[in-house]
Amino acid sequence: MSIDFDKYTEFVDAVTSDSSKDFVSLADRLGDLDRQGANIERLTTAAIGIAAEGGEFAEIVKKMVFQGKPWNEDNREHLIIELGDVMWYVAQACMALDVPFDDVIRGNVKKLEKRYPGGSFLSLIHI
């Protein structure tokens, strides 16, 4: 199969939002979100940080699984450190959304109860 990369990039550009391609449009969109009450600065920090730090965590696992890096205390500690970095950005997201971390976990438990109706998560929640 032959792909015309010029047509492909034209298509990508055609379906990409103006705020993804143009600084003024992006600034306008950020202003709109700010006026709507979004803590967009902190939310953006959280989104990019969670993705980046999650990638660092995944990189360590990838090297252990596919590149022969050993499972040892150093790598375990490195994973814990990276997981802590992920949690730092999760805290940023909680602040951006004005939601306590406990409420996020409670919401996840409720979602899991619906997904796995045979399971019991009540012991996880202290009332």
Residue ranges and their predicted role:
Residues M1-V65:
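Extended low-complexity intrinsically disordered regions
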Residues L30, N72, V104, L122-S123:
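Residue-level signal for alpha-helical context at structural boundaries
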Residues A47-A58, E73-I105:
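An amphipathic alpha-helical micro-motif enriched in hydrophobic residues
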Residues M64-N72:
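Acidic/His metal-coordination segments adjacent to aromatic residues that form catalytic metal sites
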Residues K111-K114:
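A short structural micro-motif
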Residues I125-I127:
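Conserved small/polar residues in nucleotide/adenosyl-binding loops
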